[in-house]
């Protein structure tokens, strides 16, 4: 899930629609609401955030420090002004990257992945996706590949696979996966749907790989395990 902070509801709603077409869930806040949320959000919820996108708002320079107090996810600022000085000020405030409008959400996703690669937060990564054993994921709306061949998946299963690979080495519980895929405020979907998605994903991976790469432990959660 990506958190978008902007003074304008029209902008946060627009990002929700655009990212949604790529299978990415977003949650939008005004700066005031974001301050209250980031102060009180439970640890397991904020750990499900994949990135923060800071749009035009009066507190644009202050927000990166607030985010860093709670989370290490990539922070990207959207610069509406064609000003070098403003761009430099945004970098000095602690953002990981600055993009200028107009920008496609796929470029934003690619920049998020590049930040993760530089931070060493993912598995073996290159300019074109993240490789874990025979599996390559892209996190930009494209289907994953297994041994270089496209491996089409429904959107939710694809996002779960991407999230597990992005968090290789960590065991993720059902709540964390649900929050990352559906958003932390989605009350219309039951968390148990995660078990159904993962069951289907495991069956497909087992059929393609000849083994099940997703390890599960009751009460502890799931992790992807490929040597």
UniProtKB/Swiss-Prot annotation:
Residues 1-116 form the Response regulatory domain. PROSITE patterns: OMPR_PHOB, RESPONSE_REGULATORY. Residues 127-226 bind DNA. Transmembrane segments: none annotated. One of its GO terms (cellular component) is protein-DNA complex. Disruption phenotype: Inactivation of the ftcR gene down-regulates the activity of the fliF promoter region and the production of both flgE and fliC proteins during vegetative growth or during macrophage infection. This mutant also lacks the flagellar structures under growth conditions in which the wild-type strain is flagellated. The mutant is not attenuated in cellular infection models but exhibits a marked virulence defect after 4 weeks or more of infection in mice. Signal peptide: none annotated. GO terms for biological process: regulation of DNA-templated transcription. InterPro entries: CheY-like_superfamily, OmpR/PhoB-type_DNA-bd, Sig_transdc_resp-reg_C-effctor, Sig_transdc_resp-reg_receiver, WalR-like, WH-like_DNA-bd_sf. Keywords: DNA-binding, Transcription, Transcription regulation. It holds the Pfam family Trans_reg_C. GO terms for molecular function: phosphorelay response regulator activity; transcription cis-regulatory region binding. PANTHER family: REGULATOR OF RPOS (PTHR48111), TRANSCRIPTIONAL REGULATORY PROTEIN TCTD (PTHR48111:SF67). This is Flagellar transcriptional regulator FtcR. It comes from Brucella melitensis biotype 1 (strain ATCC 23456 / CCUG 17765 / NCTC 10094 / 16M). The lineage of its organism: Bacteria, Pseudomonadati, Pseudomonadota, Alphaproteobacteria, Hyphomicrobiales.
């Amino acid at each position: 899930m990506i958190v978008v902070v902007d003074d304008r509801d029209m902008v946060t709603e627009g990002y929700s629609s655009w990212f949604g077409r790529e299978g990415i869930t977003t949650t939008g806040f005004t700066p005031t609401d974001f301050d209250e949320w980031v102060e009180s959000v439970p640890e397991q919820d904020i750990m499900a955030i994949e990135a923060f996108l800071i749009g035009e708002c009066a507190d644009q320079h202050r927000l990166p420090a607030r985010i860093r107090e709670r989370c290490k996810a990539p922070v990207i600022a959207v610069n509406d002004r064609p000003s070098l000085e403003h761009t430099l000020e945004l970098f000095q405030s602690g953002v990981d990257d600055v993009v200028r409008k107009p920008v496609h959400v796929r470029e934003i996703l690619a920049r998020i992945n590049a930040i993760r690669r530089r931070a060493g937060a993912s598995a073996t990564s290159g300019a074109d996706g993240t490789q874990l054993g025979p599996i390559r994921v892209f996190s930009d709306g494209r289907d994953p590949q297994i041994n270089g061949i496209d491996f089409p998946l429904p959107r939710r299963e694809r996002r779960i696979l991407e999230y597990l690979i992005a968090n290789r080495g960590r065991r993720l519980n059902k709540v964390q996966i649900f929050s990352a895929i559906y958003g932390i405020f989605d009350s219309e979907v039951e968390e148990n749907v995660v078990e159904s998605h993962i069951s289907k994903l495991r069956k497909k991976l087992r059929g393609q790989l000849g083994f099940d790469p997703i390890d599960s432990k009751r009460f502890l959660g799931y992790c992807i395990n490929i040597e």
